[in-house]
Amino acid sequence: MQQQIGIFEAIVLGFVQGITEYFPISSTAHLRVVPALLGWADPGTAYSAVIQLGSLLAVLTYFYKDLVEILSGTVRALRTGDTQSREVRLFWGIILGTIPIVIAGLALKSTLEAPGSPLRALSVIAVASIVMAALLWLSESLGKRTRTMKGIRVIDGILIGCAQALALVPGVSRSGSTLTAALFLGFQRADGARFSFLLAIPAIFLSGLLELKVLVDEGFSGGIGPIVAGFVSSTVFSYLAIAWLLKFLQTRSTLVFVIYRFFFGALLLGLLAAGLLPDIEPVRQALNLP
């Protein structure tokens, strides 16, 4: 069921979505946690997925030239028979890399959207944030960072796509899991992030389109205004986040995000243990939280 959301709340949630979708810190987690901290209702998976379409518009705009090159290069390769061109490898890497999250998403859809789903519990988000922080740190420590987009293989896309499927669990982070996988595979940070963002396009599109249908069927019970406000806010801040992060990763490591994720997860666990944040009832009882 769609929650009632005001214009101001929508703009704030769009800002949160835009900044956190492409930073490796989990947009879904922050869209769940920020409302809880501010005393707002959980916007739900449908609204969250629809404002992700703003993030989709941003990445399509930012990578417009890349996408044109990939598509035109693939069409050209079909004519010439050059199946090993960079554009063809990127194309199939993105297409095949999207399959794991589609399969997992369909399998878990009812669980993720069920009222009081344990997967949307704040305690789950906290643990996922800490675990992914550790994995991101390991990928920074062990990754060789010698590979670029020029040498990407289709199998790289599939492996990174499998990592993307983990992001269905709030707190994992789509960009976090895919960037971590890319670093483990030896990619340079900025190149890993670029492929991560390109790989996100089909997944965000399919997810947002599916949930948009849900909101249309419900007749926009929360009003069209908050949806538009959240979409515009998400678009603007997503574009800024993409541009900033790619420039940042050219010279810096992801350590700042590792530290943030550790503290974010630890803070959540502390607030839950102190009874200052409510968790989903079955999880709260299982963990004996106040």
UniProtKB/Swiss-Prot annotation:
One of its GO terms (cellular component) is plasma membrane. It is found in: Cell inner membrane. The chain crosses the membrane at residues 5-25, 44-64, 88-108, 122-142, 152-172, 195-215, 226-246, 255-275. Its main location: membrane. Its EC number is 3.6.1.27. Bacitracin is thought to be involved in the inhibition of peptidoglycan synthesis by sequestering undecaprenyl diphosphate, thereby reducing the pool of lipid carrier available. This is Undecaprenyl-diphosphatase. It comes from Gloeobacter violaceus (strain ATCC 29082 / PCC 7421).
